[in-house]
Amino acid sequence: AVSFVLPYFFATFALYVIPKNMTYLDTDKQTQADLSITEGIYDEYPLYSLFSGTETKNGKRMMLDWITSPLNDISAIRKRQEAIAWKELPELPLDEEELDFIEYYLEYRDQIKRPNILVSLTSAFDRLLRHDAQRYIIRRGVTLIILLLNRLDTLRKNTLENAPLLLKELAQSIQDTIHGSELKEVIGLYKDKEKSPSNYTIDKYDYLFRCIHFELIRGLLSQIYMLDVCRTAQHVAINRGFCCCPEMTDTMDLSITGFVHPFTKEGRSNDWKMPNGNICILTGSNMAGKSTTLKAITIAVWLAHCGLPVPARSMICPVFDGIYTSINLPDSLRDGRSHFMAEILRIKEVLQKAKSGKRCLIILDEMFRGTNAQDAFEASVAVNELLKKYLHCSFLISTHILEYAKHFEKDSACSFD
């Protein structure tokens, strides 16, 4: 399996970088595994690998959070989309190495003391006699943060009136953080890397940055990582021809034009629309591409809920409360569970989600393939009759059992592709 799950996180990353006021789409591990969100099966590439080319390490971590935590808040989704589509996204204020050094400096474990001129002079004399790596870390960390704050303030001033809401919020956050605190003291101070602050100034701002306003600095860094994510997503959209702004709607309209599976080489694009009724049945022989089509549609819906570009020319997508799939189900020798039993349990599980009243997209690929054709036909018909009751959900079902499809060809709740 190909995996892009990051092995560790900075201790404070989740606390300061991942937002707490979002509402998220409901899903589960089986769905993420079926869609290869972070880990590919059968040598497939993970979906995350498409968007993992961020400029910073914490940008990667934020992108991982975005792609594994789809939203069901239409305004939050649109806010991300508009920022990614904005052609004048600013560059990052510092490069990856400089931002990594700031992270290291902020987490550096030493005794921070209140600034004192006498102590600064004494420590300066000591450093003439020996090489002090500790002092280098503090001096460079302070200097880089001063440079960062000045460049962020310039970014704020250059934000256009017609900029997307996400960028306006970024500019306002910079304004409130810097100019609403003692951090404003450094604006205009040592803008050039060549100029070096005095030892007392270093001690003063080290105390300010790591003791008094540690959380404010962390908050500003999170804004930079968010900008990194938006720039990376925009780069993917441009290079691959993805649609940045799928139209998110409160209705159940779901249609997509020119969609492809993002990892299908020289794949042929398709158009698809969820017609009247809540069930769409995809028919075709084995190896005809039904599973790939189901995955391609579901990946597009998933990415749209992440606020990320989708592999299509255009798309209209409902804001779902949940996405669930039954595609690659494992059996279990340990539990004595056959593939057929795994299918039954999974379908029961997703039906419980549909019964909850939430608006869900549910994907069922080749139901009951673990048994004979007659039993699979009868069981599929029984499940289909249940699905017709849940008009608040959309069901995409693939099958090569033509008798099953013919059984519902005149049913207004079902459509075929």
Language-model region placement:
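Extended, charged coiled-coil "arm/hinge" scaffolds of SMC/Rad50-like chromosome-maintenance ATPases
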Residues: 181-205
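Long amphipathic alpha-helical segments
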Residues: 155-161, 236-245
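Short, positively charged and aromatic/hydrophobic N-terminal segments
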Residues: 3, 8, 12, 16-18
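Charged, surface-exposed helical/loop "interaction arms" that form contiguous linear patches used
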Residues: 198-242
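Short hinge/gating elements
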Residues: 47-52, 63-66, 204-212, 284, ...
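ATPase nucleotide-binding head domains, primarily ABC-like/P-loop NTPase cores
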Residues: 240-417
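Conserved amphipathic alpha-helical "coupling/scaffold" segments
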Residues: 21-182, 216, 220-226, 259
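Structural signal for well-ordered, non-membrane alpha-helices
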Residues: 85, 228, 348-351
